[in-house]
A protein has these predicted regions:
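Class I S-adenosyl-L-methionine-dependent methyltransferase catalytic core
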Residues: 1-213
Length: 213
């Protein structure tokens, strides 16, 4: 099976280096188990849709054509929340499935004073259930229950009070694209360089421009 995502990686090769945008936004191909790039610490808001369980995580490495020996999903989400704590944004959102919802809420409560979660869906199908956990140091409870995750990301990028949003699993760039549309900075990392190339292409298609540094 070939996961080339429309060959965007040939037009926007980002397997090495950092893509820096004219507004200071930055994207890099990166494995979460490696030390976090410094630029990720500039974020005051975070939204990430990380792998939801061990098999999901393994498929991310397979699609990225990277051989990895993952002992447990616990190892991954522990590292994920280490990164969230290090970024130390005012507010953070994490998308997750039912299997690890309780663990994500517990981890979020270790970092943030106010934690809530929303019932959500993905791919705009009511049968595709997921959850979005929100942690913040300020009390605020946006009415996001029942919204599709794509619409939640759109709402977050449009309505939260922030200067720069981080995504630790940028994928094909929903967070970056919505931040850019709202004239906000974004920083992001992604394991799969071919998926991150799709993000670059999407941003260029709406007027973004970058250099490699």
């Amino acid at each position: 099976v070939n996961w080339n995502y429309g060959d965007a990686y040939k037009r926007h090769p980002i397997n090495k280096g950092i893509a820096k945008f004219s507004n200071g936004s930055m994207l890099q191909c990166h494995d979460i188990f490696n030390p976090l790039p410094e630029f990720m610490l500039n974020a005051d808001l975070l939204f990430t849709d990380a792998p939801w369980n061990k098999s999901n995580l393994a498929s991310f490495y397979t699609k990225a054509e990277i051989t990895a020996f993952i002992d447990s999903y616990d190892q991954f989400y522990t590292r994920l929340f280490e990164c969230i704590k290090q970024i130390n944004s005012d507010t953070a959102y994490c998308e997750i499935g039912k299997e690890y919802l309780a663990e994500f809420i517990i981890e979020m409560k270790k970092i943030y004073k106010y934690v809530t979660f929303y019932n959500s869906t993905y791919y705009h199908k009511k049968s595709n259930l997921c959850y979005v956990v929100r942690g913040s140091n300020k009390f605020k409870k946006p009415k996001l229950d029942g919204m599709d995750e794509e619409d939640i990301i759109e709402w977050v990028c449009e309505n939260e009070d922030y200067k720069c949003i981080a995504d630790l699993c940028m994928g094909r760039g929903l967070v970056a694209v919505n931040a850019y549309k709202n004239e906000k900075k974004f920083v992001g990392t992604e394991l799969n360089h071919k998926r991150l190339s799709v993000t670059l292409e999407r941003l260029c298609n709406i007027g973004g421009n970058y250099i490699f540094c």
